[in-house]
């Protein structure tokens, strides 16, 4: 009997293992999941420890919790990302950051670390209090900031459009429609009693043979040179005189839109060129081993050479600033001048 019991004790785990191996392989392995979670936790802890060690190496006994607190704000993080893409900022940080780190860990600064930490703690507490009063500090971004700055313009535009629409609707309902209705009744009356003008105005309708080719030519020229705009319907006017007025109004709206677009494009030209210059500068800085002054001067000279070559190439093939319409390696440039 004891030997049988021993056999049962040995074979039972084997059967359980066999059943476990024959389970559906699509089901997640709890042991693997736990190991993965532990690995992720260890990596996160390791990264946190590395970050803390880096701060300790750079700051010594200084805590500077206020600085760390401010760096958690989205708008500050966005500012840092923008600054990293500006060539001049990269150069300034590369030249000053090592010196600042040396000053921070120097003996005179470390000697007054307790005093600095005391005021830093007070400043951090004050910042936490401000966050409770103004919680939007934790979520503020440049996009939201721009929306808040543009809020007066957005509201004035919205309610201005509502006012214009209401005024136009009231004018149509209470002025144009009653007057136009009486004119149509009078026209119907003299068409029946005196002269049949076939629904056209008595005087303006006589000008149709002259105005029809003029209106057609004017419409073709407008669409050819000012393509952006709504098309004027041909079958919704009682005479060519009225259609001509609509074509003139359509021409003015298209012209204003085209001129404003060109003005905006020309106004953006210096910004676009500055953006292009920064992209070329960053590309040449990335080619250097580091951002020491010698390599910075070399990258600056290469940038000046590249920009000069671009301008001369644009002048010689009579396409000055055509490269604004192309994509730069640093990002998309506005399509300004062709």
Swiss-Prot record:
One GO CC term, this protein: lipid droplet
Positions of the UniProt region annotated as Disordered: 14-37
Polar residues biased stretches: 22-37
Keyword Transmembrane helix on entry: no
Keyword annotations from UniProtKB, A to Z: Meiosis, Sporulation
GO annotation, biological process: ascospore formation
Its biological purpose: Not essential for sporulation. Might be a component of the cell wall.
Protein name: Sporulation-specific protein 4
Species for this entry: Saccharomyces cerevisiae (strain ATCC 204508 / S288c) (Baker's yeast)
